Amino acid sequence: MPFIELDTKTNEPVVHDYFTRFNQSDFIATADLFSEQGILKPPFEKMINGRNAIAQYLEKEALGMTVFPTHMKTTISDRSYIQYQVQGKVKTNYFTVNASWLISLNTEKEITLVEIKLLENLSDLLAFKNH
């Protein structure tokens, strides 16, 4: 999986592990990277809260998906958390779309939030649904 870092100071193993485990379809291990009350915010869906719920959601919704992160940079950093902005692509059996991930880590290096946004316009996405 190619991973190009824009911010050369950014080298966070947890972020890399998130994408690696996701691409291996090891969703329990992916969810284990989250804090106990971690949140996954998929596009167009309600928030998924907690490791078990995240693992179940990924098993149901993400099987067959592959993510290709290409750029990562630190966006916010303070004593209580750090955020990374990642851009790349998501490939499904039906299409490939540009995406971004906002990933927040706590001081224990656990993921507290992954917010995923698709960087395509809604009419393009609806066209896939109609085919």
What are these regions (language model features)?
Residues 36-37, 94:
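Short hydrophobic/aromatic segments of transmembrane alpha-helices and their interfaces
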